[in-house]
Amino acid sequence: MKKKILAAVLACALSVSLIACGQTDTTEPDGGTADQAATYTVGICQLVQHDALDAATRGFIDALNEALPGQVVFEEKNASGDPANCSTIVNGFVSEGVDLIMANATPALTAAVSATADIPILGTSITAYGVALDIDNFSGTVGGNVSGTSDLADLEAQANMITEWFPEAKNVGLLFCSAEANSRYQVDEVTKYLSAKGITCKEFAFTDTNDVASLAQAAAEFADVVYIPTDNTAASNKEAIANVLLPAGIPMVAGEEGICTDCGVCTLSISYYDLGRTTGEMAAKVLTGEADISTMPIEYTAATPKYDPDVCELLGITPLDGYTPIEK
């Protein structure tokens, strides 16, 4: 009898040890533990930590918790800016059999799409789904197991913003990461609109964080104005960019508020938190069967013209009417 009791105790201890070894970072549902309340497991793959993507993830979680209180466990993973890590993360989600994957930024989305054709995938902070997923004549709906939200602001309006704020500008430097397909798309479109206005555009494309500062310096030496699209690598290195452009007195127009803040003059801003919330609302509909993801169109959010008051003051630029100051 003593031997049986001892064996039972050892088995229990081993079971507890194995459970502890298998833990991952999770956000438990409000109002209970994962074992008690969770109905769904959602894997979140975020490319890199920076303000915009962080806000989108936060909005996603908040909206889904509000829609399905006490029913969702979130597994949050950050790829630390490495697309290869995105593949590792989403393959882990697939092996675990999560109920839905939220892919925050384009490399996370493409990794998820490559990993599964069965688990629903919702993207957020994706600039152009057609470009990211190599879809010809993209009509607004991806189909299959993929949908989501886009952070794309009107690119013609961005080009017009450059000429409205800086009507004397002749040379525009386009600073972006060549490894980000969405950045290439934005740069090509903005170049098309600016060239039609007689403005000379020159690309300054960095491949990774190592050459951001040197390319920013080259852009500053060429340009009257620098344009930076919605670009994750640029957003993660905006301090290095600001340390070059601001002392040189070169104004920058940004594709999104995160890059503009403390670095640029003006932007067409969207709320990444609201973008994430919209994605979370879509997720609730997919998880409960209220909506078929294969027919869900990509959703967008309205942009607000904003300016950075500190940068404008530093560069001696008077803000245009109709622009709201960025709150810090």
Task: Describe these PLM feature segments.
Residues 76-137, 231-246, 250-255:
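Beta-alpha junction/loop-to-helix N-cap segments that form part of ligand/metal-binding clefts
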Residues 129-171, 270-291:
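Hydrophobic alpha-helical segments within soluble ligand-binding/sensing domains
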Residues 181-250, 256:
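Pocket-lining segment of extracytoplasmic ligand-binding domains
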Residues 37-61, 67-69, 75-85, 183, ...:
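Extracytoplasmic "Venus flytrap"
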Residues 19-33:
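Bacterial lipoprotein signal-peptidase II cleavage site
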Residues 4-23:
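Sec-dependent N-terminal signal peptides of Gram-positive bacterial secreted proteins and lipoproteins
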Residues 285-328:
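Hinge/cleft segment of the Venus flytrap/periplasmic-binding protein
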Residues 42, 60, 147-194, 295-312:
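An alpha-beta-alpha
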